[in-house]
Amino acid sequence: MEATVVATTQLTQDSFYQPFSESLEKQDRECKVLKRQRSSSPELLRCKRRLTFNGLGYTIPQQQPMAVARRNERERNRVKQVNMGFQTLRQHVPNGAANKKMSKVETLRSAVEYIRALQQLLDEHDAVSAVLQCGVPSPSVSNAYSAGPESPHSAYSSDEGSYEHLSSEEQELLDFTTWFDRYESGASMATKDWC
């Protein structure tokens, strides 16, 4: 009796899946024929069994393989460009090349900090230049002009009482700026005399 139940069940399952299995066999044959016809085509080399559920009232939308391949290639190129950009940015950010691996977020944060520091440095330089071009030199500034242009250490470095509120970096910047401005004005004067 068990053999009869198993045989009946098997017969019912076979009749239910028969149209579906015939559809799969047909697709396999078509895929093999297409592979033989154009084996060099990349989309046909990746020929996968595509199931159609027409009998169930549902069809799976099929995308164009070449369009998908082009879209994937564009995305790979975009990601590659982004990664190369971050690699270049890491090389220009302080301590970026020294660190073993900075994440993209860390790289961007470091770049923002670096840009802010450079902007602050420019602002300070502009402020110092404006004070020096004002034409009202303080005694320490006039002493600074008496030092030779060959020395980056001007009289500012010995007169620390006039800018105690500045940090050591700001003091060095002020010393260098004073020396550079004197050197630059001396070079422009020599150029005018030479012409």
From Swiss-Prot:
Keyword Transcription regulation part of the UniProt annotation: yes
Example of a GO biological process term: positive regulation of transcription by RNA polymerase II
Name recorded for this polypeptide: Achaete-scute homolog 1b
Tissues in which the protein is found: In the 24 hours embryo, expressed in hindbrain close to the anterior and posterior boundaries of rhombomeres 2-6 and in ventral cells close to the floor plate of most rhombomeres. Also expressed in the telencephalon, diencephalon, tegmentum and spinal cord at sites distinct from those expressing ascl1a. Not expressed in the adenohypophysis.
Cited function: Transcriptional regulator. May mediate transcription activation by binding to the E box-containing promoter. Involved in neurogenesis. Involved in maintaining rhombomere boundaries in the hindbrain, probably via up-regulation of delta expression. May mediate transcription activation by binding to the E box-containing promoter.
Organism, scientific name: Danio rerio (Zebrafish)
Molecular-function GO term, any one: RNA polymerase II transcription regulatory region sequence-specific DNA binding
Any Pfam family matching the protein: HLH
Localization: Nucleus
The UniProt record lists the keyword Nucleus: yes
Assembly description: Efficient DNA binding requires dimerization with another bHLH protein.
InterPro entries, A to Z: bHLH_dom, HLH_DNA-bd_sf, MASH1/Ascl1a-like
Positions of the bHLH domain: 66-118
Any one of the GO CC terms: RNA polymerase II transcription regulator complex
Region annotation (Disordered) ranges: 141-164
UniProt keyword terms in alphabetical order: Developmental protein, Differentiation, DNA-binding, Neurogenesis, Nucleus, Transcription, Transcription regulation
